[in-house]
Structure formats: structure tokens, C-alpha cells
Amino acid sequence: ERGYTKRMVPDTYVQQSRGGRGRRGMATRDDDRVKVLTLASTHDWAMFFTDRGRVLRTRVWNLPEVSPAARGTSIVNLVSLEPDEKVTCVLIVRDGDMSGNLVFATRRGEIKRTAISDFAHLRQNGLKTMDLEEGDEIGWVVRTSGNDRLALVTARGMSISFHESDLRVSGRTSGGVRGIRLDEGDEVVSFVPCPPGGSLVLIGQNGIGKQTPWSRFRLQTRGGKGVRAAAINDRTGSIVAAVSITPEDTDLMAITRNGIVIRMQVSDIRVCGRVARGVRIMRPDAGDEVVALSAFGPDNLDFVEVSAPVELDPEDLLEGDSGDDSADDASADDVAEDVTVTP
């Protein structure tokens, strides 16, 4: 959150059984925490989106490759941030590939779709990407083909899945429309695509998580309250991150506020229903909590590892793990009208 960045090769972290503590991934100060974890090639562009609705970019090779214990370099050494401006989201884009759209989502549930070609010629001082309401910020940017299904996930375990055609393509500097109707005190924690045959992996702040096929989530119209994606309680903590798994993804990495990383096989994560709580994925230290997830497949790695299968530990199963999908569907009157944010 204080604006440091770095890169490491994935095989810095060997696969572990789920439920472990992990190992050091990034040095942080007491008043700092890890915010983004993602996979990239050194030839890709890293697009940095800020709390002021701007985007700047640099080549991934400009990010320092350092050890897990190192903090990295300040982003201000790589791109032209304004005083007190903070990076809230990072998107990795292949060089020269300007097809499709970018769909933005904010912490307060606003969404917007813009042609990626609008960002083909980024100036050194960046470009305006979205007009934001006071106190809101861009949390996620998903690249789409124009025919994709997308989903928002909230801290209280709600999710809404909708087709991107529900969103008209708008100009680069325009505001957003309502993606999900949030209860008071709730906020969006993840915005992900829903690939055919894929699944949603989500995790609570205390390291409890699960995997649910996207087929368990019905397609809705944007703007409603959504359906229950996870049951939460004091043991699970609030949902803090979610990632969309494709059939090609083999590995999952989770990182905590204090920079501890664990890498495991996707197949180790139990597949269960929407209203289940899940199993222990990671065991954060006292005072620490999980903050981010990332998934990747063999194409992202320089090697392929095969580990022995992990048996399900009965002590890690939580009450309510029946996987019953019958509860908590939102009613039809939860669908909201478009809310346009005036520039």
C-alpha cells in the first residue's frame, strides 16, 4: 500500500500442502501491507491504476527482480505518480495486443466498460480512466473479448454474475454504473471473469477458503444484490480475495498482509457448494491475514512439478459444508436501474 513493487520467478516458491504457513514473500513495514499479487512475462506491460482514476504503465522488466526478503523499489521510480497518489490495481497486458475491452470495478460496486484501444497511446504522465465518486477507487480491471461473463464478490460473501453486454462501451473519462447493490458496511473484494468450465476460489482473512464451479452461479442482470457465494463467521473472517480458475490453471498462490506466501495445487482446494464455508487453505500467524490470491498454469512456469495428492483433513472441515445451494438467492426486485456518475 505504500507503493513498493518487485518481481520474482514462480519457482522461488515450492508447492506445499494446503493449510500451511507459507514462507516470506515480501518485506513490509508495520504500517504497510501487500495489495496485489499477479503473474506476468518480463516483456509485458504493467498498467498501474490509481486512486485518482489514472493509469500509467511500464515494462515488467523495469520492476526489480529481487529476493523474497527484499521490499523492492518504489513505484514512483518507475511511473509519474502525483503527490499522495496511490496505486490500487495492476493489469498485465501483452505488447501490441489492443483487442477487446477493459471492464473496471470499484470498491463500492460501480462498473464500466471501455475499449482497450483507448489506452493504446499512454502518455508519460498517464491518462484519465474513470470518473470516480468521492471516497471510491478502482479496485480491479478485467480484460474481456466482448462476449464474456463477469462476477463481483463482496466481503460478506455475496456475488453477482452478469454478461458484459449488460454494459455499454463508454468513453475513457466517463463514470460507471451500478454493478452490485451492496448492503451497508459491505464492499467489493474481487472482480473476476467466469470462464466456461471454470470455478471460483475465494478465501477469508483467516485462511479458510473453497472452490465452487461457476455452473453453481446463475447468470443475473447487473445491479442486483447477487447470491450467496460463501458462508462466513468469526472463524472464516470476511472474504478478502477471490480468483477465477480455468481448466488450465494448476497452481494457486496466496499472500498475507505481512508478505507471507504459500503456493499449492488447485486440486488441493475442496470443491463445494456456494453456501459452504470451506477448508483451511493457509494458516496466517497471529495478527496477520490473507490479502490476495493468484492462479496460474504450466504456461506461466519454467518447469512442471507433480506432487502427491493431499488427503482432506477432517479437522479442517467447517460446519455448514453440505454444499447446499438453496439459500440466499436474491429476489427479482433487487435489480437496480443504471446509475450514471456525472463527471
For the regions a protein language model found, what residue spans apply to each?
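Short, structured "edge-of-domain" segments at secondary-structure transitions
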Residues: 1-343
